[in-house]
């Protein structure tokens, strides 16, 4: 398709937040959208192949985590044949999609961002609240802001990647780089905890001209379905994106057994990602694929805060409470282990931390706007966390400073809990819990090097971490000592809340491939570069001067 100009993208900026204060139009808007969506439940969601709704008659249910008797959505689950059909539909649609000029692909996602910012903001937030248990603010920064930022900034970063061309051309030669889509299809496996991430797992490879199969989380099907519908309304061709809710094992098996499998875009647990990588690796060894698949994944974390004796105590406490207990500790970046100097601990940190955590209100999003902590996502998560709390209550090495209770009579509610231990190698500092449980270790002020070693070696993860200190010499020392402990490192700020366009997100070690969502780096994983040398001069002799 011809394009007779080099178009310039509109100015790309972060979506400004709405604050939803008392009596505001924003609060009125989200409450209205929430009630309207609630009245429509349960929503019936099909498998979508080549733009056509497919009813499989194998039904799954997404339930409301704060009212688990309430069914949010009944969704048709794709079987093996449906996945095969979806792959073939994607491959048929590949030529049309990848031949569409970048300006048109960008326009689709810029329009999608605009639709979310305006027409669908409250609806997408409401689906995220009802289906995934977020309060208004957590839904806003996810489904009302971050997803928009991903869609907008991706176009900027893609434009910059395409503009990356060879710096030199010898006389009579024009050298160029072309960034081709991958040969085959990309498989996107999305998580429950961020609607924005689910959208970006599909949108990032799509923008680069790839066709995508999107498998939504069983616990976030509704919000992912709305995102799919928004992409289609924005002009995305039917063949470019297939929507295939279903059993993760069955869907993945079909995708990974197909010779045209070209890429995996994943957010989820470390154990699952390792298993998927192993399957792909075995298939590569057996020569199953046409090309080596690109594997991009962001997984677990056991994220830390280190509080030095020079830290401003109130700020360090506030940041710890927010990082540990916003969205019930179910962010990949959530604070899970806290290392506090003895001086800071005894000079106000302990009392302030305990007071702040005990003051947090727990409950459903709109029953009380003051509710800070909501439910964990499902029964399995609740059971795991309840077992941890019961074990902690009888463990002689642990003191429960706050919380410790769990109740699933109506929803999956776990109290925000603080566990103190003198054993820095205890399981509570090692294992990812993915819930509102914060483990604290108090270190001697002169043992800073030792605590750095603990932070760096206690867990296999390397996702996020923060240090709190006013002494700049200490800041420099800790920044250097903890260089590989976190892919996102914060100084005097919480370890959550990375902003697209400001802090590209991702970690290494067991936390993933560190390809940095919200940056051009991740887009570069979904292209296959071609170097082109265009020579204008004629060759007139086989021999070189040295041959004479």
Swiss-Prot record:
Chain positions of site Transition state stabilizer: 193
Active site annotation, chain numbering: 298 (proton acceptor), 332 (nucleophile)
GO molecular function, one term: 1-pyrroline-5-carboxylate dehydrogenase activity
Pfam family, one: Aldedh
Any Gene Ontology biological process: proline catabolic process to glutamate
Presence of the UniProt keyword ATP-binding in the record: no
GO cellular component, one term: cytosol
Alphabetized UniProt keyword annotations: NAD, Oxidoreductase, Phosphoprotein, Proline metabolism
Superkingdom of origin: Eukaryota
Keyword Phosphoprotein: yes
EC number: 1.2.1.88
List of residues that carry Phosphoserine: 391, 394, 396
Reaction(s) this enzyme catalyzes, per UniProt: L-glutamate 5-semialdehyde + NAD(+) + H2O = L-glutamate + NADH + 2 H(+)
UniProt enzyme class: oxidoreductase
Pathway: Amino-acid degradation; L-proline degradation into L-glutamate; L-glutamate from L-proline: step 2/2
Family label: Belongs to the aldehyde dehydrogenase family.
Protein name as annotated: Probable delta-1-pyrroline-5-carboxylate dehydrogenase
Species of the source: Schizosaccharomyces pombe (strain 972 / ATCC 24843)
Lineage of the species this protein comes from: Eukaryota, Fungi, Dikarya, Ascomycota, Taphrinomycotina
């Amino acid at each position: 398709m011809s394009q007779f100009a080099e178009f310039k993208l509109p100015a790309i900026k972060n979506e400004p937040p709405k604050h939803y204060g008392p009596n505001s139009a924003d609060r009125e808007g989200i409450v209205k959208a929430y009630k309207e969506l609630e009245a429509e439940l349960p929503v019936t969601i099909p498998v979508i192949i080549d733009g056509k709704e497919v009813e499989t008659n194998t039904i799954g249910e997404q339930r409301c985590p704060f009212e688990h008797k309430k069914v949010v959505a009944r969704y048709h689950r794709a079987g093996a044949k449906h996945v095969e059909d979806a792959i073939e539909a994607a491959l048929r649609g590949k030529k049309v999609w990848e031949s569409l000029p970048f300006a048109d692909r960008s326009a689709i996602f810029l329009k999608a961002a605009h639709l979310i910012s305006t027409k669908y903001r409250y609806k997408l937030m409401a689906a995220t609240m009802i289906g995934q248990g977020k309060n208004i603010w957590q839904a806003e920064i996810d489904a009302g802001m971050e997803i928009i930022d991903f869609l907008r900034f991706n176009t900027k970063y893609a434009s910059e990647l395409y503009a990356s061309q060879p710096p030199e051309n010898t006389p009579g030669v024009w050298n160029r780089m072309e960034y081709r889509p991958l040969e085959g299809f990309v498989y996107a496996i999305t998580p429950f905890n961020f609607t924005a991430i689910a959208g970006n797992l599909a949108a990032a490879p799509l923008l680069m001209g790839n066709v995508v199969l999107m498998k939504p989380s069983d616990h976030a099907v509704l919000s992912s379905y709305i995102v799919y519908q928004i992409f289609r309304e924005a002009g995305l061709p039917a063949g470019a994106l297939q929507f295939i809710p279903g059993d993760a094992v069955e869907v993945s098996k079909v995708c990974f057994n197909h010779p045209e499998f070209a890429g995996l875009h994943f957010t989820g647990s470390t154990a699952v990602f390792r298993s998927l990588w192993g399957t792909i690796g075995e298939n590569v060894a057996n020569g199953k694929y046409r090309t080596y698949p690109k594997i991009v994944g962001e997984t677990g974390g056991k994220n830390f805060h280190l509080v030095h004796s020079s830290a401003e105590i109130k700020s360090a406490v506030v940041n710890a409470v927010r990082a540990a207990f916003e969205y019930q500790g179910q962010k990949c970046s959530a604070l899970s282990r806290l290392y506090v100097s003895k001086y800071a601990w005894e000079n106000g940190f302990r009392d302030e931390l305990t007071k702040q955590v005990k003051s947090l209100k727990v409950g459903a999003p709109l029953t009380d706007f003051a509710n800070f902590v909501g439910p964990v996502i499902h029964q399995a998560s609740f059971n795991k966390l309840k077992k941890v709390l019961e074990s902690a209550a009888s463990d002689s090495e642990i003191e429960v400073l706050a919380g410790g209770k769990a109740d699933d009579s109506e929803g999956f509610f776990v109290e925000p809990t603080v566990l103190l231990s003198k054993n820095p190698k205890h399981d509570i500092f090692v294992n990812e819990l993915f819930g509102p449980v914060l483990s604290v270790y108090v270190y001697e002020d002169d043992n800073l090097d030792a605590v750095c070693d603990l932070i760096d070696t206690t867990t296999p993860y390397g996702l996020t971490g923060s240090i709190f200190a006013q002494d700049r010499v200490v800041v420099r020392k800790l920044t250097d000592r903890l260089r590989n402990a976190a892919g996102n490192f914060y100084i005097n700020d919480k370890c959550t809340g990375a902003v697209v366009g400001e802090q590209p997100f991702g970690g290494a070690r067991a936390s993933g491939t560190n390809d940095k969502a919200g940056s051009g780096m991740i887009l570069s994983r979904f292209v296959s570069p071609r170097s082109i040398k265009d020579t204008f001069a004629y060759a007139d002799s086989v021999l070189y001067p040295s041959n004479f």
